[in-house]
Amino acid sequence: MQRSVHELLTPRTIDVKESSATRAKVTLEPLERGFGHTLGSALRRILLSSMPGCAVTEAQIDGVLHEYSAIEGVQEDVIEILLNLKGVAVKMNGRDDAELTLSKKGPGVVTAGDIKLDHDVEIANPEHVICHLSENGEVNMRLRVARGRGYEPADQRGLDEDETRAIGRLQLDATFSPVRRVAYAVESARVEQRTDLDKLVIDLETNGTIDPEEAIRRAATILQQQLAVFVDFDHEKEPERVEEEEEIDPILLRPVDDLELTVRSANCLKAENIYYIGDLIQRTEVELLKTPNLGKKSLTEIKDVLASRGLSLGMRLDNWPPASLRGDDRVLGG
């Protein structure tokens, strides 16, 4: 293999071995020495802390005012029920929140599969146990599901709603990340005569709302988006605001020669860097009278010519000079 000593290897092989619908090992090779840990650590952090997903964030249980309660006929206390609700793997399609209900009478086991779902909401682990009911036990609850990212403690959510939140609306710490566990290992790899290369092996498990391969793909996309700014530092700059200029009356863009003034008056104006009609109308009578060789007779001539075109001296143009004339040094007084 002919390769410049300055050229870094890029991975050529990616292998995905799924041991189940929720667990897989992803192998990436070859990598330059050290890149296995660099990429493995970054992807692991993103997979655990930054992946978007859905979770139960609030529960209302009939007859329960706070989490330190107990429900007659239910084996678990409310705190245990809330902990079990955190383990429900929810997936929403095309929406950011949902209100779900769960009602069941005993005896029996209450599972995630007993939750009544909307058409665009799925439960990936319907067998997940929520609580156990005795013969006379009954449970009725309303659950709020929301979309988020990573982990969100209940005390950091909706602080502005605390005063209006009804008693009995129990808040849950939410683990939105669909990734349950991630581990990575770096092994030795070989390419022809080189034996100092890395092979990255990522072992991950999800909650079933996303397959492991897609989880890796999303994590890599997040990492790519975060690093993109370093590829082109122009991305750091805020887009320049292009201010829309008001339409300029075309007559103002015409040279003063078009006014057909006397040679004396025209030469006096050019001596003061007044080349366009737009320049002229912004001057006052006092300013023009200070122009060498321009007397009251010439001033009257200029005023009359401008008046015949519906213009006058002392007018104000906020957007002058326009972009079309900014390259003309004469307009800038050059």
From Swiss-Prot:
A GO cellular component annotation here is:
DNA-directed RNA polymerase complex
* UniProt keyword list: DNA-directed RNA polymerase, Nucleotidyltransferase, Transcription, Transferase
Question: Where is the segment annotated Alpha N-terminal domain (alpha-NTD)?
Answer: 1-234
E.C. number(s) listed in UniProt: 2.7.7.6
Q: Which SUPFAM superfamilies match?
A: C-terminal domain of RNA polymerase alpha subunit, Insert subdomain of RNA polymerase alpha subunit, RBP11-like subunits of RNA polymerase
Q: What is known of its domains?
A: The N-terminal domain is essential for RNAP assembly and basal transcription, whereas the C-terminal domain is involved in interaction with transcriptional regulators and with upstream promoter elements.
Put simply, this protein is called DNA-directed RNA polymerase subunit alpha
**Organism of derivation:** Marinobacter nauticus (strain ATCC 700491 / DSM 11845 / VT8) (Marinobacter aquaeolei)
Tell me the name of the encoding gene. rpoA
